[in-house]
Amino acid sequence: MAKTSMIIKAQRGSKFKVREYNRCPLCGRPRAYYRKFDMCRICLRKLASTGQIPGVIKSSW
């Protein structure tokens, strides 16, 4: 319940621009957010490993 209310609160926007923060649209996670992909690290890893994000490959060196 608390997580759902925080997601709705983040979508609403705030009175001041500085208080807004990014959340993952898939899971709602506020931390470890990648702007380039518009998702959190966990969802990014899950989708990249299944090949659903074009251009992202697993690196090996």
From Swiss-Prot:
GO molecular function: rRNA binding; structural constituent of ribosome; zinc ion binding
GO cellular component, one term: cytoplasm
InterPro entries reported in the protein's UniProt record: Ribosomal_uS14 (IPR001209), Ribosomal_uS14_bact (IPR023053), Ribosomal_uS14_CS (IPR018271), Ribosomal_uS14_sf (IPR043140)
GO biological process terms held by the UniProt record: translation
Protein known as: Small ribosomal subunit protein uS14
Keyword Metal-binding: yes
Gene3D superfamilies given in the database record: 30s Ribosomal Protein S14, Chain N
Function: Binds 16S rRNA, required for the assembly of 30S particles and may also be responsible for determining the conformation of the 16S rRNA at the A site.
Pfam family, one: Ribosomal_S14
Cofactor: Zn(2+)
Key words, A-Z: Metal-binding, Ribonucleoprotein, Ribosomal protein, RNA-binding, rRNA-binding, Zinc
Record text on subunit structure and interactions: Part of the 30S ribosomal subunit. Contacts proteins S3 and S10.
Gene: rpsZ
Family affiliation: Belongs to the universal ribosomal protein uS14 family. Zinc-binding uS14 subfamily.
Binding annotation for Zn(2+): 24, 27, 40, 43
Organism for this UniProt entry: Geobacter metallireducens (strain ATCC 53774 / DSM 7210 / GS-15)
KW Ribonucleoprotein (keyword) present: yes
Cofactor note: Binds 1 zinc ion per subunit.
